[in-house]
Amino acid sequence: MSHHDGENEGTSADSGYDDFVILLDDDGNHIGTAPRATVHSQHTPRHLAFSCHVLDVGGRVLVTRRALTKVAWPGVWTNTCCGHPRVGETIIDAAVRRTHQELGLDLDPRRMRVVLPDFSYRATDSGGIVEDEFCPVVVARLSLPEELVELNPDPDEVEEVAWVGWQDMYDLARSMPALLSPWAVEQMLEFGPDLPVVR
């Protein structure tokens, strides 16, 4: 997704593995799959996703502005990366894969942690597209300062990137939530103003 609509999530090399999202019941049990390209609509079923927040060595968070061509929430600022795990793929592995695809950034799984394992949300964008996701949240910690982090954003996914202080991101979610994606707002409010601990 994405985020989250994920319409551009596959590539020619791996789209055969990336064409489906995992459908869930109200208790979070897997109940099947559905084509990723068609699952997001005004009647989106509950499905599995993830969100990732990448921090530099000083604790600044990488935020992205969704591409203007995205089906849902185009041009909206959000967390670093979101996506849909493949069948059999862990949340961490999915976050590594999508962050590389969307931003050209290689994350170290040893420096990542699922910090909000039970996060879920439902939201409707201005065009009527619904998101309904069980969406564990990952935080990844880099060993470099932001100025040494090399990024290569995919223009089909990402319009702009910025590094912001964690407190600033939290304050933005509290005071001007309309500037951010609804999932990023809810996640930041659950996190609170203090940096999550990642080894």
UniProtKB/Swiss-Prot annotation:
It catalyses: isopentenyl diphosphate = dimethylallyl diphosphate. It comes from the Bacteria. Coiled coil: none annotated. Its cofactor is Mg(2+); Mn(2+). One of its GO terms (cellular component) is cytoplasm. Its EC number is 5.3.3.2. It is found in: Cytoplasm. One of its GO terms (biological process) is isoprenoid biosynthetic process. SUPFAM superfamilies: Nudix (SSF55811). InterPro entries: Idi_bact, IsopentenylPP_isomerase_typ1, NUDIX_hydrolase-like_dom_sf, NUDIX_hydrolase_dom. It is an enzyme of class 5 (isomerase). Residues 45-186 form the Nudix hydrolase domain. GO terms for molecular function: isopentenyl-diphosphate delta-isomerase activity; metal ion binding. The active site is at 82, 133. Keywords: Cytoplasm, Isomerase, Isoprene biosynthesis, Magnesium, Manganese, Metal-binding. Mn(2+) binds at residues 40, 47, 84, 131, 133. The keyword Cytoplasm applies. Pathway: Isoprenoid biosynthesis; dimethylallyl diphosphate biosynthesis; dimethylallyl diphosphate from isopentenyl diphosphate: step 1/1. Catalyzes the 1,3-allylic rearrangement of the homoallylic substrate isopentenyl (IPP) to its highly electrophilic allylic isomer, dimethylallyl diphosphate (DMAPP). Belongs to the IPP isomerase type 1 family. This is Isopentenyl-diphosphate Delta-isomerase. It comes from Cutibacterium acnes (strain DSM 16379 / KPA171202).
